[in-house]
Amino acid sequence: MKYVGIDLGTTNSAICSFDGEKIHLYKSPEQHDVTPSAIFIDRRGNKYVGSRAYNSAAKNPDNAAVLFKRLMGTSTPVKLPAVNLTMTPEECSAEVLRTLFGYLPEEIRGDGDTGTVITVPAAFNQMQKDSTMSAADAAGLGRVALMQEPVAAVMSVMRQRKNDGVFVVYD
């Protein structure tokens, strides 16, 4: 079984996989370790996610959705007035998740035996967690589990260090 880990961040997001031995971080098409959690829709209706969306948002903020993770678990819509479009925070997050999943090699994406873990802030309430699960479902990720960010950090440190000890993780 293969595992995929996703940091669905407020500002930036990232994706990696674990094959049982090694963790692989997948870069964006621009060769960045992280992808901006941004969506941009141009006047023709073309949708962009990531760096191009983030860079375009600076010039045309009314065509862009950024910082939508802060709205997860609420009924507050994400408005893109320049293109007369309203999206839910879940729809925005699903776009980012689909984009990240597209960075994976086909043998991982097409594997029906891939489990996905998405990290969420420790302060996320149940509505925000449910909203994140809805976004993952809308993105077609299949089997998904959520893990609080500090827990994921401790697990990463424990995997890298084989000796006993006390580890403190600050988030």
Predicted regions and their residues:
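N-terminal phosphate-binding loop and flanking beta/alpha elements of the actin-like ATPase fold
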Residues: 1-36, 41-170
